[in-house]
Amino acid sequence: MKRFIRELNSFVKGIILFLRPGVFFFFLSRPLLFVSNLLSLTKWVSHQKRTGILNDFYRPFRNHADRFKLYENITAKYGLANEHVNYLEFGVYKGTSFRWWVNENKNPDSRFYGFDTFEGLPESWGTYAKGDMNANLPSIDDTRIKFVKGLFQDTLFGFTDSHSIDNGIRIIHIDADLFSSTLFVLTTLARHLKKDDIIIFDEFNVPNHEFFAFKMFTESFYVKYELIGAVNNYYQSAFKIV
């Protein structure tokens, strides 16, 4: 029976390849992918705890400033204000969240790295066009910081080869927006991840982008994690590697 099923599957797949339905129906691929990822997201949400952590689900309207409540909660819960941390932020823009973490942490051994093209999005994202959200390097007076300008795909390999980021508590803040950028960052840093590392997402509940990238990454690399906080219906979410 199993052999028959395998042969039938192979035969049907061959027929489909021969007929090439993608020539006529490819326009459906993006909306179908969105529906698939949205269903995965809602299933994921149904399994997340809402007690014992900061989690405001459900709320009818989003307040982007509440992301700072998430940062404050994480900092207080894990005593990060005075700990030695390596903070890596991907998608700095004007440096608002980057500056918050620099000001909050007082440990002189901590290091803060901000990655961005500073020339805007490398590809379109939702209603944003390629090149939107460009900004100048933020002016922050602190010797512990360093900005890495360029595409993540061009800069991150060289950075990990030349910088030690395995000491202290590692905080990875992903505000990359895009599926491609998010997946690249996660897979590149996979070999560095260790227990208790913290990963924060700024647009996590966007089905086809940060959520999809995180789902593919954790499933492909067998990464175990737990949710440690979320605001704005999981738009901003934080996880700890376990």
Tell me what each language-model feature is.
Residues Y58-L70:
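Conserved SAM-binding loop and adjacent beta-strand
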